[in-house]
């Protein structure tokens, strides 16, 4: 997971602060949280335009980091704005937060048992294509970057996109 966090920052335009021994400690310190968030989001999936609990979790986390938060973007989306302490460009990082009307067929302890309405039918819902992981990683990247705000040149937008798979 740490390698994914580092890669996300490297490819996001945050290269200048993505390296160094101090940040390695930050990545390592947050790794367990990211895994926990991913499992919680996986176990509690929400279909597109219904990601109310997911959006609330994201917004609370970003606010706890001192990141400016806008909710209700595209109905259930969340955007966080982290202004670095030095002038510079704006970089956007994005994660999709919706799940799919698909049954989960495994025995993981954090398996989804959530049901939702899709096209008038009650259906099983799960994160079948990684949106839970994308969301958890971006929450982790936000935490590391907020902690290192003094090293950031410019502004970072954290975009948590709802209904990427299309409305149910």
Predicted regions and their residues:
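Structural motif
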Residues: 72, 129, 159-161
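Acidic/His- and Gly-rich active-site-bordering loop/insert found
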Residues: 19-126, 133-154
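Surface-exposed, flexible loop/turn segments at secondary-structure boundaries
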Residues: 12, 99, 164-166
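Intrinsically disordered, low-complexity segments enriched in glycine/proline and serine/threonine
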Residues: 5-6, 124, 168
């Amino acid at each position: 997971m740490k390698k994914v966090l580092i890669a996300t920052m490297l490819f996001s335009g945050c290269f200048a602060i993505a390296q160094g021994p101090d940040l390695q400690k930050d990545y390592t310190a947050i790794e367990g949280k990211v895994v926990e968030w991913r499992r919680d989001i996986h176990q509690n999936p929400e279909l597109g335009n219904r990601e109310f609990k997911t959006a609330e979790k994201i917004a609370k986390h970003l606010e706890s980091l001192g990141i400016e938060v806008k909710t209700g973007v595209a109905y259930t989306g969340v955007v966080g704005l982290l202004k670095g302490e030095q002038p510079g460009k704006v970089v956007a990082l994005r994660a999709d937060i919706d799940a799919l009307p698909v049954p989960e067929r495994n025995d993981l302890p954090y398996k989804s048992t959530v049901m939702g309405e899709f096209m008038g039918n009650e259906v099983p819902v799960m994160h079948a294509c990684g949106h839970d992981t994308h969301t958890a990683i971006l929450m982790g990247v936000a935490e590391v970057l907020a902690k290192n705000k003094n090293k950031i040149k410019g502004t970072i937008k954290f975009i948590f996109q709802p209904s990427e798979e299309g409305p149910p």
